[in-house]
Amino acid sequence: MSLIIYTDGASRGNPGRGGYGAILQWGGKEKELSAGYKLTTNNRMELLAVIKALEALTREGLDIQIFTDSEYVVNAVEKGWVFGWEKKNFAGKKNADLWQRFLRLYRKHRIRINWVKGHASNAMNNRCDMLATRAADSGNLLTDEVYEAEYYAQ
């Protein structure tokens, strides 16, 4: 089975309130995911959007195309940076907690991550942006515990 995933992350300030949005499409079906956080960064929300979409899957071994406007996510995976970071135990790298979570999920499937221009003519990316910004602006915000612990420890 093949699956298409569109993702986006948003933050109101960097750091600040943030949110992610994801849309999964398969076999004529569609599922939307989103959530907002009290204090986070845009890159954490971009990566968390991908993670939450992959965590929503109930099967392994899928062919997945992910579309995101995050050069951070695309380059880290498609240029192989994240695998080098992993070999060095993510020493000095931001968002190590999320990258480790991502890699556990990534290895369960055949995934290709594609870049799309944000805030442009890609209707699905625009929908994900709407989901992410609505979540960031909602009154029901979650705590990004790892980020907040690091932020307040500074």
Positions of PLM-derived features:
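RNase H catalytic domain
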Residues: 7-17, 51-127, 131, 140, ...
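RNase H-like nuclease fold core
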Residues: 1-44, 48, 54-62, 134, ...
